Swiss-Prot record:
Its main location: plastid. The gene is PTAC12. Component of the plastid-encoded plastid RNA polymerase (PEP) complex. This is Protein PLASTID TRANSCRIPTIONALLY ACTIVE 12, chloroplastic. It comes from Zea mays. It comes from the Eukaryota. It is found in: Plastid, Chloroplast stroma; Nucleus.
Amino acid sequence: MASCYNPWRLFPGMSTAVPAGPVTAPAHSRTCKSSKVFSALPHRRGLLFLGTRRARIKCVKDDSLHFDPSKIEPPPYSSYFDSTSGQLEPASGARASIPGKEYWPEGTAARVRAARAPAPVGESAGMPSFGTKPGSRRRGYKEQVTSASGTEGAQTDDRKDGDEPDVAIIGSGDDALEEIKDSVDEYVIYETPEEEELSEYDMDKMMGRPHPFIDPAKAMSLGEPKTSEELWWHWRRKSQEEEMWSRWQRRRPDVDTVFAKAMAETGQIKIFGDHPSRTEAALAKTRRHLYKEERLEAEQRRLEEIGPIAYYSEWVEAYKNKDTSREAIQKHFEETGEDENVQLIKMFQHQTAGEYRIMMGTDVRIQRDPLAMRMREDQIKQIWGGDPVYPTINYVQDPDEVIDYRGPEFHEPTPEVVPYLMEHGIMITKEELYARLNEEREDVNQDITYIPEAKDPMATAIDIGEHSYNEDSDDEDEDVDKAAAQPQSLEDEEDDRDDVAEVEEKVNQNWSALKSTGQAEKPKEKSKKDEMTLKEAIDDSENLTDFLMDFEETE
């Protein structure tokens, strides 16, 4: 190894002996001490680190210094007993459960390094202030360190004339940075967290206890609840004649609506108007479902507090005005010797069958909802109906009663089907139907023109194509020759007969046209071939062959 000798700055009064060997700058061989020695001198603090002249450092190779490898502290253990697998596991290596450092996830190395940090060295000279004066003991030292780093190696200007310039040499800049880091890390300032004063609502919300949906301190006041007529969702179209508003305008009493109204009467919820809307009924149903267990627990606590006689006397009309407190029961026990159970049985002997059904419901094993147990008789009938044998509550008794079906959905009453269809012309009476049929029959009789019967029935028969095309053309030539030989009067009669046969043939082929129009199509008047032009001949001819034949004849 090589041991280094740091030349220190020469102060007045120190010896200036030069050691053997080439030294370019005046140096003083002393043992290496920290630069903090001079910072501890109050009258020398201002002169520290102000010199700019640097000296050459003498390094001497010394092989006498060596280290013993056995002095290196081994790891605390090479294997450990893993509680998960129940076997000895190596602490390092390929089979180790803990992987090497290069495989650690992000942030693990920093946490391990922080856990291995040594305790701060040194002893505190002052008394702790417990956070009242944070950092006061280190304030001067921090300023000095920052000034030292800022003016590192600077030359002093306040030296006397003729004196040698003072020299300040620092081993390295990294040491100064490490000292600054150490000074920052060694002292931790603890700030006591401010305790939040939670309101009752915030505390209930944080602990999960039942609490309102909106903070009561921040909730807006809704004012007085409006009546049913003032609420916008009960609006209805004004009728032409003033009519009495019927009870059928309300929603039909079902379980949710009746329970919502009962909950509003007992103060569990608040509804706007005389009757709950669909939304309010749905919300009340949800609330009733969620908090039923809590209500049952509250009822059980009440039963234990006031005693069973006072609790169950609510459903015994004969005991309404009787004192059922624990003191009265104890007094009765002292007088007669009847304990609480005997008095309870005696009370239930005065209970009617109807009161028992209300109290227990249909099944004694069912834990009844206390709200349902305390509902009025009319509310219970609205939900479950009255007597199932002779129903009196959920049915309309008068068969001629006109029911107003207008409900909160704002649709108009369902009209009668027959008058509605007759009004829109979809349905007509039987008399109107017969009248229209007679009119149509007369119109058909007037429009149809009867065709005289042909003498020869075969003349009206449709030619299915017995002859070939050449034979037909030969027959036509013969007809032309015959026509030329006949006189004019006979020709006219034959033309008329041909026209009638042609009309009859068209009627047989297309009877629907005659039925719809009522008139047979008249045959086109054939002009004489001498007067036909080329265009008319093309239009008149049925196909190209006929046109060419006609064209040859005209030429």
